[in-house]
């Protein structure tokens, strides 16, 4: 029963995640990328304020610093994602955003000197093929939206990497 609920939960999260790209694409018809970002972060701030109100008084200086750094990485990822979506398709935007997962081990290798394993290399090579198939045009150039979206993936990859580092240093 727990496994079935877990699978259902993953399917629901996947639908919501994928639907977000289409919803953002539709929103871009009426709003600028930074208007979308403003609404997104305003709603998130209000919800976090409601749910974390009791914990706000106990936040340490380190948590504020780490949270700010993570916020910059996260904001960069979202901003570049929305800007990229303005110039590419929702499907390209979603796939290229998801390449952040294979970027994290390389960031860990470059910054933290963490050794790469075979799965990291094979996964990255496979993702690179997917990026090429989706993004390369007939003259082997890559579209503006796809470039923005790849940088968005880097922002999210840094956020994931730094969350792992900072999470070990605070409560």
Q: What role is predicted for each listed range?
A:
Residues 27, 36, 40, 84, ...:
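Hydrophobic/aromatic residues within transmembrane alpha-helices
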Residues 48, 68-70, 116-136, 152-156:
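Hydrophobic transmembrane alpha-helices of multi-pass small-molecule transport proteins
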Residues 20-21, 49-97, 133:
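Specific transmembrane alpha-helical segments of multi-pass solute transporters/efflux pumps
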Residues 14, 48-52, 78-81, 108, ...:
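Structural signal for membrane-spanning alpha-helices in multi-pass inner-membrane proteins
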Residues 47-56, 100-122:
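C-terminal transmembrane-helix exit sites in multi-pass transporters
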């Amino acid at each position: 029963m727990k496994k079935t609920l877990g699978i259902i939960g993953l399917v629901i999260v996947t639908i919501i995640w994928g639907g977000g790209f289409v919803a953002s694409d539709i929103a871009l018809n009426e709003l600028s990328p930074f208007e979308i970002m403003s609404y997104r972060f305003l709603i998130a701030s209000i919800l976090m304020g409601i749910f974390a109100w009791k914990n706000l008084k106990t936040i340490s200086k380190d948590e504020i610093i780490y949270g700010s750094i993570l916020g910059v990485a996260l904001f960069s990822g979202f901003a570049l994602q929305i800007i990229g979506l303005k110039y590419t398709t929702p499907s390209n935007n979603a796939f290229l955003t998801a390449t952040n997962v294979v970027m994290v081990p390389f960031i860990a290798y470059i910054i933290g000197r963490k050794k790469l394993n075979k799965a990291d290399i094979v996964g990255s090579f496979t993702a690179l093929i997917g990026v090429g198939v989706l993004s390369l045009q007939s003259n082997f150039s890559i579209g503006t939206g796809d470039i923005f979206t790849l940088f968005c993936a880097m922002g999210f990859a840094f956020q994931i990497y730094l969350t792992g580092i900072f999470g070990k240093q605070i409560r």
